[in-house]
């Protein structure tokens, strides 16, 4: 299991007192492909409740900037992740509103919601948000 996947699993809201967690997704764009190498984690300044996460701490941007510099510009900000206290998460109205207002970029942005049993993965491109969870028919 990769370190990034292990970190996502460690923040799942498995107990009734668990609070939402979240951060940035960092990695490399290789043409049409995206390789996730790192994430920022919740920390000082962030707002965390059972049903809400607000990324407020400066440490998220500092990690993006640090990895960008260390990699000579290869590692970049790819998007956002956070948890939901549900087995099979779906974006809330608040999630969608936040992504549309706050994620302004020319490149597609990765969106991940970590649930207790599964995850929701999506891409935001312009004002379009699409789930990547649908199965692809290979027949």
Language model segments and positions:
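Conserved beta-strand-loop surface patch within small alpha/beta domains used
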Residues: 1-77, 86-139
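Conserved residues at the C-terminal ends of beta-strands
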Residues: 83
